[in-house]
Amino acid sequence: GDLDSWRDAWTTIFIKRKMYDLLACAMDSFGSILMQFTQFEGFVWHLGGKTSGTGKSLTLSAKAGVWGHPVRYRTGKGTSPVAMQNRAGMLNSMPLLIDEITSTQRDNMEWAPGFIFNHTEGQGKERMESSANKERINDTNWHSTVTMTSNEVLTDYMAGARKFSSNGELRRFLEWTPNVPLQWTSQELEAVRALKLHFGVAGEAFIRWVVRNQSTTRRLVEETYDQLRNEMGFSGDERYWNAGTATTVAASILTSRQYSKIIDVPVLNIIDSLKDKVNRSRAVIRNSIRTAEDVLNAYTRDNYGGFIVLKRQPNGETAASWGDGSMFSGPVIRSKILGRVEFEVTKEGYVDYFIEEQLLKEHCVGMSYGYSDFKVELSKNYVVTVVKKDMLARTKGPLLRVNALHICRKKTHEAEDSLPVEPTET
């Protein structure tokens, strides 16, 4: 192929159609080799969504065609994680492209978060030599970006369905989820077909120019990084977004006729597209932040059937039942008791809430939330104490005193079977 034909195809497909979201993702293919001019080893793009024909595969083909064959350059869904790391090491600064991680992610929902974290660390895993008690020399490293496609929306899983905290991984990748099928004219279809005939030429021209102009490249990447940090308001924990967007924008500038003369792209539109993706990710993180109350409510929701519920009856006596509504009777094993709720038992108009500390600590660990932080945060708004509580008191059961977290709230008109924690007036 030749560079002019490649340029015409990109111009017809991306620029004339004003497909700036797709173009921004595609320009990251040039930006990948600029990652070594930042302080970071890697960045991740994910193209997701269940709708077909929206441009995910086209974007991957366009990115692959910058450096090699649009199809054979990228790895397939059957590639093992170790092989992917080896490929990233061999490509070094060229982008790693992974097509269809849907089945891999569904088989192991923790695969993608782990992969995102590992790739942005820039180094393969350490291994031992099979014939000696010593480590192998680990020369599998990289400074590059990776782009993955799937039918999933990773931010939905990592910000909601995932039980563990995902803030670190969420801030190391950006996601594009197109949902409008693309329609093509005959001329545009010819341009799409041309991508499979003219490939590998743009990347070669770009890397040759970068090698000859490293000081100019480094200066522009650093300036772009600083400008985007100010323009997009990147904070310290958003540094990977800053690096990933900076390399893409810098590549969009360096490929212009003012520098390497490869292709002129609308830089401002690309910046707007990147800004939109960053703002979407910020919104996801903002809405997914877990508070101590969220952790407590999650414990209640998952375990309320194992709570002992005591309610004061009209005659002044108390009646005990399980949270699922079944009556409390006969001997009970300790492991079945997951909490205790007392409705107006000790004080009229108040509900007392007890959970064994050991169980609550295990729950906090499972949700990646420090127990000490949990108590401190909860104490900012509610009266929280640690007491020695007989979890079977007033049930005719044996003595069962444990260290328990005690929360007291005012009873409201809400249903008694729900346990929203509300500020307690003191």
Regions found by a protein language model. Name each.
Residues G1-R72, T245:
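P-loop NTPase catalytic core of nucleic-acid-dependent motor ATPases
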Residues I15-L23, G48-S52, A83-R87, T102-Q105, ...:
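Alpha-helix N-cap/helix-initiation motif
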Residues Q39-K56, L60, M128-N141, F164-S165, ...:
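Short, glycine/acidic-rich hinge or "gate" loops at secondary-structure transitions
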Residues F40-V44, P70-G76, G124-S130, L154-A159, ...:
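Acidic/polar loop patches that form or flank catalytic/metal-binding clefts of enzymes
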Residues V44, V71-R72, V146, F173-E175:
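Conserved beta-strand scaffold positions in the cores of enzyme catalytic domains, especially
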Residues H46, L58-M109:
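AAA+/P-loop NTPase substrate/partner-engagement loops
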Residues A88, M94-P95, T104-D107, W111-Q123, ...:
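Extended alpha-helical interface modules used as scaffolds for assembling large macromolecular complexes
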